[in-house]
Amino acid sequence: MQQGRTPLGAQNEAFPEKTMIFGLFGKKNNNQVIVDRQYQALTSAARMPEFYERLNVPDTVMGRFEMLSAVMILFFRRTRTSGTSGQEIAQEIVDAFFQDIDYSIRELGIGDNTVPKRMKKLAGMFYGRLEAYAKAMDTRDAEGLAAALVRNIHPKANEPVDMRGLADWMFVAEDHLLSQSEDVIARGSATLPKVA
């Protein structure tokens, strides 16, 4: 785990096959300072208190995993059409995300023999969300995105949970990321908007 990152189970935690397409735990290139800067910005965005206080994201370890997954998905969608440097940064950021998850599972005292199985499950959850959110976002379907967020963030809810506010923020965030230049992406300086 990179110095300066906090484990999933800690207060204000940074969470840290379909593929470990990104070469999970593979060799790094020379972008580490850029990657660390962008990763910190993304994890900070995922910890904005408004998500947990106003937009119905549970302030729990899994709630924060869900929020960071959403932020990572937004960044991945922005960089999918970027040049080589942007795609390399995205690859290393997703690697860092899963490394933090692995570290956090071990910090919680999970036995080494079960970590790979749990990692595989969490990776599957992440890529499942990537597909579900993309289906709604590609068609600008806010209601569909809100429904997908309810299924993933509140799978056991006994009463309806309104996730339209988070869905609306994700569309605003996607537009915000698209407005940022390739140079900003390559420098690891992309930002996400505050919750209105």
What are the residue ranges of the model-derived segments?
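Surface/interface-facing alpha-helical segments and adjacent flexible terminal/loop regions used
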Residues: 15-196
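Short, Lys/Arg-enriched N-terminal segments with co-localized hydrophobic residues
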Residues: 2-20
